[in-house]
Amino acid sequence: MIADPAAISEHTIDLHAENFKNTRYDGRRFSLSNDTVTALERIVCSIQFIYGARDALPHSELADRANLVERLHPHSEFVVVPDAGHWVQYEAAADVNRLLLAFMTASA
């Protein structure tokens, strides 16, 4: 989840435990199925994908995911944040916020 084990604190563990406890959605089932592609095919607006370069969870290579996005949504944005893991928005909050604001401003 977190790329740098030194960044894991009691707060991080508590946050993950609370999120896990409140989850009502099985993301593993969705990410391992063709439902992801089907859902992406139905989206008609631009999409921004933000991944951490050190995310150990994708079930395919980031390059494969980027190619899929390019094929399905050539005008969308696929960004890989260096030195971040699956919790890219937690580990690289300033970078993710900057990317989101730039994307939303350009899309407005």
Describe these PLM feature segments.
Residues 1-5, 19, 50, 56, ...:
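Phosphate/oxyanion-binding loops and surfaces in catalytic or ligand/nucleic-acid-binding neighborhoods
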Residues 6-10, 59, 90:
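Non-catalytic, surface-exposed connector residues within folded enzymatic/regulatory domains
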Residues 16, 40, 49-52, 78, ...:
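Generic structural signal for small/hydrophobic residues in well-ordered secondary structure
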Residues 28, 32, 60-64, 92:
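Residues at alpha-helix caps and immediate loop-helix transition turns in enzyme cores, especially N-
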